[in-house]
A protein has these predicted regions:
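Short, Arg/Lys-rich segments that mark the N-terminal edge of DNA/RNA- and chromatin-recognition modules
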Residues: 1-29
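DNA breakage-rejoining catalytic core of tyrosine-based enzymes
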Residues: 24, 100, 144-147, 158-177, ...
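Basic/aromatic-enriched alpha-helical hairpins
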Residues: 43-46, 62-119, 134-141
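Basic, Lys/Arg- and aromatic-enriched nucleic-acid-binding interface segment
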Residues: 121, 125, 140, 144-200, ...
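C-terminal catalytic core of tyrosine-transesterase DNA break-rejoin enzymes
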Residues: 140, 188-191, 195-202, 264, ...
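Conserved tyrosine-mediated DNA breakage-rejoining catalytic core shared by Y-recombinases
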Residues: 152-156, 165, 169-174, 196-241
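Catalytic-site neighborhood detector that most strongly recognizes the C-terminal catalytic loop/helix
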Residues: 166, 220-224, 234-236, 256, ...
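Active-site/catalytic core of tyrosine-dependent DNA strand-transfer enzymes
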Residues: 232-272
């Protein structure tokens, strides 16, 4: 039964205590509002339709992300990248909204603004996917009641046109020269990236003890599975020429430094629209041009599916024409 009483400041406070349900209370400007609220809540309880939304209404998106990062992100391979996305969400105007308050219209506003700013569709999709998983965890694992996933009602950005950028021999030569003037390790990093089609993170976490004869054994991969990458004669020569480090790592540079140095080298070499990840695309395409099968290429590059490989295998038209005769 609800108890309604007027407070000293003139507002009305309604309290509901019912066996089997949490105690609830709320303040209102008028007695009629308090009575209406009490009747609705008690009616839902009687019909077994009551949902306790207090946690959903009192927990902000930023607070939820703080818990998510502690309990979920920490176990992920990409925790560092996810931390940056979480930080951006938490600091935004959406971070101060409660989980119950954030609507699909808010996320549509975010989507359109980010695309207008020039963010890629994939970048926006990743940010929205993070919000979606936050709500999935909050509903399923944390048991926060009264929530629905706002991303499920949202139109996601269309996939960006997949990059098909391959450097010419002249461009690669110019970038290698410029990179050598920036940092001594950069030319080897660039060449080995092309020769092996390794991801940036895989290459930079490579340890000397994992370079074994004609193979490099990758203990830390994006997919979390151990992988052996065959080394070409050129790749092996480049690795052998690098000085041994006391810490056992093959390279000293951090991933973000390599990306920055690569962009600077491209700028100095007057090479436009070339990203470090394009080197993996180039290396993968070269493997196909050498006649390797999809399964063979996948075992080298670590791509899990044929559809993922298609993203990288834009074979040179001249080579295809040669095969046709």
């Amino acid at each position: 039964m609800a108890t309604i009483e007027q407070r000293a400041n003139g507002t009305w406070r309604a309290k509901i205590r019912k066996k089997g349900y949490p105690s609830l209370s709320a303040s209102f400007d008028t007695k009629a509002e308090a009575q209406r609220w009490s009747a609705e809540i008690e009616g839902d309880m009687s019909r077994k339709r009551f949902v306790d939304t207090r946690e959903a209404e009192s927990t902000t998106v930023a607070q939820a992300f703080e818990r998510y990062e502690r309990e979920v992100s920490a176990a992920k391979k990409g925790a560092r990248q996810e931390h940056a996305r979480i930080k951006t969400w938490s600091a935004s105007k959406y971070g101060s909204k409660s989980l119950a308050e954030l609507k699909s219209s808010d996320l549509a506003e975010y989507r359109d603004a980010r695309l207008k700013e020039g963010a890629s569709s994939n970048t926006v999709r990743l940010a929205l996917a993070l919000i979606s998983h936050l709500y999935t965890v909050a509903i399923k694992d944390w048991g926060i009641e009264g929530l629905s996933n706002p991303v499920m009602k949202l139109r996601m950005p269309k996939n960006s046109k997949e990059r098909d950028r391959r450097p010419s021999a002249a461009e690669l030569k110019a970038v290698l020269k410029a990179a050598g003037d920036i940092h001594a390790e950069m030319p080897a990093i660039i060449e080995i990236a092309v020769e092996t089609a390794m991801r940036r993170g895989e290459l930079l976490t490579l340890r000397r003890e994992n370079v074994k004869g004609k193979y490099a054994v990758l203990e830390e991969t994006k997919n979390g599975t151990r992988r052996s990458v065959p080394l070409s004669t050129r790749a092996r020569a480049l690795l052998d020429a690098l000085p041994a480090r006391i810490d056992g790592n093959v390279f000293s540079l951090a991933p973000h430094s390599v990306s920055q140095y690569f962009l600077r080298a491209c700028r100095d070499a007057k090479v436009t629209d070339l990203h470090f990840h394009d080197l993996r695309h180039e290396g993968t395409s070269r493997l196909f041009e050498k006649g390797l099968s999809i399964m063979e290429v996948g075992s080298i590059t670590g791509h899990k599916t044929l559809s993922m490989l298609k993203r990288y295998t834009h074979l040179c038209p001249d080579n295809l024409a040669d095969k046709l005769g």
